[in-house]
Amino acid sequence: MRHRNSGRSFSRTSSHRKAMFSNMCCSLIEHELIRTTLPKAKDLRRYIEPLITVSKSDSVASRRRAFNILRSKSAVGKLFTDLGPRFAKRPGGYIRIIKCGYRDGDNAPMAIVELMDRPVSSDDTEE
C-alpha cells in the first residue's frame, strides 16, 4: 500500500534522486531557466522553494543549510547575494513552470522552469 508516501521515485535510488534534484537546483540558480520533464519540474518545487525562503535571511546557519543541499559554493553565493534580496518581498511562488510540448524520441512531456522576476536579456537560450 502507498499510504502517505509523497513524492515520486523516478525509478531511482534515494541517493540518485537527491543528487539529481541537487544538480537541478544548482542549474536553476545558476541559469535561472532550465528545461526538463514535467514530473521532474513539479517535484523540483519541493526542493527549490524552501531554499529560496531560507536565503531571505543571510546567516551562517542559513548558508550551511543551503550548502548541505546544493553542495556548490557558487550556487550558494548567488542564492544569498542575488536571489534572496530579489525575493525578499515575495511570500512564495518563486518559480514558474511552463509546459513546452513533448520530447522527440520518447514523447515525454517537457516543461521550462524559470525563476519569477528574472531579468530578461535578448540572448536567453534554453538549457
Swiss-Prot record:
PROSITE patterns: RIBOSOMAL_L17
UniProt keywords, alphabetically: Ribonucleoprotein, Ribosomal protein
Pfam families, sorted: Ribosomal_L17 (PF01196)
Highest taxon listed in the record's lineage: Bacteria
KW Ribosomal protein (keyword) present: yes
Cellular component aspect of the GO annotation: cytosolic large ribosomal subunit
The UniProt record lists the keyword Lipoprotein: no
Single GO MF descriptor: structural constituent of ribosome
GO BP annotations, alphabetical order: translation
Subunit structure: Part of the 50S ribosomal subunit. Contacts protein L32.
Record-stated family: Belongs to the bacterial ribosomal protein bL17 family.
NCBIfam families noted in UniProt: L17
Name of the protein: Large ribosomal subunit protein bL17
Organism for this UniProt entry: Legionella pneumophila (strain Paris)
GN (gene name): rplQ
